[in-house]
Amino acid sequence: MESKFDLEGLKILVVDDSKTIRRTAETLLAKEGCEVFTAVDGFDALSKIADHRPDIIFVDIMMPRLDGYQTCSLIKNNQVFKTTPVIMLSSKDGLFDRARGRLVGSEQYLTKPFTKDELLDAIRSHSSKSDRTAGS
């Protein structure tokens, strides 16, 4: 099995106002050896990003205060974090939502509820992009 070899030690931030989604993702990813941080909304996420410098960020679209599109846009407009992969999470699966996610700079769009394999595949497909943090 290739399970842990490429995920061990990766820092992942999960931003979602749903405690269930945060806990589920945190549990699944921690079992794979990831260091997982969670945030309840975009504002919370911005401070956690600055503090922990995650390798990959999962962001829910529909959140209070600062939604996922706004959060992603702020991340991608920051010189330090613009290359950090952002994967949008949403219960909506419309073409408009996916396109809007791309416009603000997200690398991928996962529809909730997601499976363990979808979550891990998303991380694997973008973790090579975050190897830049290994040397910094």
Roles of regions detected by a PLM:
Residues 23-31:
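Charged docking surfaces used in two-component/phosphorelay signaling
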Residues 33-40, 48:
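Short hydrophobic/Thr-rich beta-strand motif most characteristic of the beta2 strand and flanking loop
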Residues 52-58:
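Active-site beta3 strand of CheY-like receiver
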Residues 63:
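Receiver (REC) domain active-site loop signature in two-component systems and cognate sites
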Residues 114-123:
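C-terminal output helix
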